[in-house]
Swiss-Prot record:
The modification Phosphoserine is found at residues 358, 360. Disulfide bonds: none annotated. GO terms for biological process: microtubule anchoring at centrosome; protein localization. Centriolar protein required for centriole subdistal appendage assembly and microtubule anchoring in interphase cells. Together with CCDC68, cooperate with subdistal appendage components ODF2, NIN and CEP170 for hierarchical subdistal appendage assembly. Recruits NIN and CEP170 to centrosomes. Also required for neurite growth. Localizes CYTH2 to vesicles to allow its transport along neurites, and subsequent ARF6 activation and neurite growth. This is Coiled-coil domain-containing protein 120. InterPro entries: CCDC120/INAVA, CUPID.
């Protein structure tokens, strides 16, 4: 062989042997050995296949009774006789002449098999329901319910058989003959067409009416179904038993009797029971009180009730005394406060803001404003010595008695009600125009205290009494401590670089006034405080109108400075001076200390740093949060 001018020769064959097909003896022997091995392998595989074919033919002969001609036989072997086995219980259907039976898709065959299986299961369920209905020693109610279950099972079986016949007719399969109708528990039969099913159910209903009339307890249970209208072929207008209506039976026929919707009492009974329970719970324990109730409590609803607010004198937070803890937690008075000693304040109008709060969270937000604004934590309840020690109701955990409020600095009319009774987001207002919340928070109060309260024209100093000619005005929480505490100002550590390292004089008593009027001691007279360290003497002076306007100006100025500090846009201290009409402030009694917080907030080091809020160096306020935070 020549490839591109080169002659290629085999190293094992010479040229004459390759041309004439003659090979060396060694090569011939190797080829023969390989062919023999291959022949042996094929014979072994053939013998295995023949054995398998022989077994299959014998199995076919056992089924058909004759040996197929494809059965392998040894040379000289005669076909053996095979005895046919007896046929099994399952009968094979004869081949249908319609070829559509053989052309069914797998999905149709699976659907047909599933429907046939469901029909067979429903037949067993109907038979079991009939046996249960015929069981002896059954009460009237049990027998009635079992008959109802049997009727449902028969109805479902009838529907499944109708579906099966429709499917077989659509697929071109022979329609199965009608099955033997199952007898009802009393001997009457129900055909597949369901002709006498309605009549039989009507007869059962009549029997139930007679049986219910004999039993007083069962006759009461059927009184709530007098309003039902007759459905279908029922002859009676009232059905004393639970769900027996025609449309209800069709609704529960979608599954087996075990999955039926359970019977529930009618809504009228539920609402009547609920109304009676609420009336029994809402009855006042004291015969001298009549608590107003909202309209929603008479309707049996479970929505949060809106309190019925009345116009008149402002209500006060009070709680009944002398009640046992169990009665206290279970009565409507558990949503009020302890009553005061004044009998004039013990009226129904004092409870209007606390009635009917069992389904809402209004009582949880009652004392937030009275405790110091929206951001302050609620104060714990301090029960009186004569009242119950522990209140079980969770709705009054944050309530406490409040003093009689004085005139507010925002109005010039009658005294405002406590903030617990004022309209809020939780309780819609129905009395008068809503009052706006205070403009500033606690930090503005501290800021105004830090800047010092202005004097009036007379130049009243620290701890001095104002002249009697001044017009007395109401006190607000921004009237502060400087006008109430006589004596020298509190002493602080001189070298305190942090507000947390300050000390306070142990002999100095300081507290914060309530947000809505005089302190409890000024309104109710001096009384022993549980903590003597928090006691504060009654005020010795009343600020004038000019001072109160100065407080507002200081608060607005503090709000402006706080905004400038936190916005990071200020280049230096930009404080607006106090209005000249206010008067000069008190001599500074606090260390004016600036806190360096870094050039990231106040700019380059060359600029004058903007002082931090000096509200941290205000007098210690321990009346609300406790002295541990200061």
């Amino acid at each position: 062989m020549e490839v591109k001018g080169q002659l290629i020769s085999s190293p094992t064959f010479n040229a004459p042997a390759a041309l004439f097909g003659e090979a060396a003896p060694q090569v011939k022997s190797e080829r023969l050995r390989g062919l023999l091995d291959r022949q042996r392998t094929l014979q072994e595989a053939l013998s295995l296949k023949l054995q398998e074919l022989r077994k299959v033919c014998l199995q076919e002969a056992e089924l058909t009774g004759q040996l197929p001609p494809e059965c392998p036989l040894e040379p000289g072997e005669r076909p053996q006789l095979v005895r046919r086995r007896p046929p099994t219980a399952r009968a094979y259907p004869p081949p249908h002449p319609n070829q559509a039976h053989h052309s069914l898709c797998p999905a149709e065959e699976l659907a047909l098999e599933a429907l046939e299986r469901e029909v067979s299961v429903q037949q067993q369920i109907a038979a079991a329901a009939r046996r249960l209905a015929l069981a002896p020693d059954l009460s009237t109610e049990q027998r009635r319910r079992r008959r109802q279950v049997q009727a449902d099972a028969l109805r479902r079986l009838h529907e499944l058989e109708e579906q099966l016949r429709d499917v077989r007719a659509r697929l071109g399969l022979p329609v199965l003959p009608l099955p033997q109708p199952l007898p009802l528990s009393t001997g009457s039969v129900i055909t597949t067409q369901g002709v006498c099913l309605g009549m039989r159910l009507a007869q059962l209903s009549q029997e139930d009416v007679v049986l219910h009339s004999e039993s007083s307890s069962l006759s009461e249970s059927g009184a709530s179904h007098d309003n039902e209208e007759p459905h279908g072929c029922f002859s009676l207008a009232e059905r004393p038993s639970p769900p027996k209506a025609w449309d209800q039976l069709r609704a529960v026929s979608g599954g087996s009797p075990e999955r039926r919707t359970p019977w529930k009492p009618p809504p009228s009974d539920l609402y009547g029971d609920l109304k009676s329970r609420r009336n029994s719970v809402a009855s006042p324990t004291s015969p001298t009180r009549s608590l107003p109730r909202s309209a929603s409590s008479f309707e049996g609803r479970s929505v949060p009730a809106t309190p019925v607010l009345t116009r008149g004198a402002g209500p006060q937070l009070c709680k009944p005394e002398g009640l046992h803890s169990r009665q206290w937690s279970g009565s409507q008075d558990s949503q009020m406060g302890f009553p005061r000693a004044d009998p004039a304040s013990d009226r129904a109008s004092l409870f209007v803001a606390r009635t009917r709060r069992s389904n809402s969270s209004e009582a949880l937000l009652v004392d937030r404003a009275a405790g110091g604004g929206a951001g302050s934590p609620p104060a714990p309840l301090a029960p009186s010595a004569s009242g119950p020690p522990v209140c079980k109701s969770s709705e009054v955990l944050y309530e406490r008695p409040q003093p009689t409020p004085a005139f507010s600095s925002r109005t010039a009319g009658p005294p405002d009600p406590p903030r617990a009774a004022r309209p809020s987001s939780a309780a819609p207002a129905s009395r008068g125009a809503p009052r706006l919340p205070p403009v500033c928070g606690d930090f503005l109060l501290d800021y105004s205290l830090d800047r010092g309260l202005p004097r009036s024209g007379g130049g009243t100093g620290w701890g001095e009494l104002p002249p009697a000619a001044e017009v007395p005005g109401p006190l607000s929480r921004r009237d502060g401590l400087l006008t109430m505490l006589p004596g020298p100002p509190p002493v602080y550590a001189a070298d305190s670089n942090s507000p947390l390292l300050r000390t306070k004089d142990p002999h100095t008593r300081a507290t914060r006034t309530k947000p809505c009027g005089l302190p409890p001691e000024a309104a109710e007279g001096p009384e022993v405080h549980p903590n003597p360290l928090l006691w504060m003497p009654p005020p010795t002076r009343i600020p004038s109108a000019g001072e109160r306007s100065g407080h507002k100006n200081l608060a607005l100025e503090g709000l402006r400075d706080w905004y400038i500090r936190n916005s990071g846009l200020a280049a230096g201290p930009q404080r607006r001076p106090v209005l000249p009409s206010v008067g000069p402030p008190h001599p500074p009694f606090l260390h004016a200390r600036c806190y360096e917080v870094g050039q990231a907030l106040y700019g380059a080091p060359s600029q004058a740093p903007l002082p931090h809020s000096r509200s941290f160096t205000a007098p210690p306020v321990s009346g609300r949060y406790g002295g541990c935070f200061y």
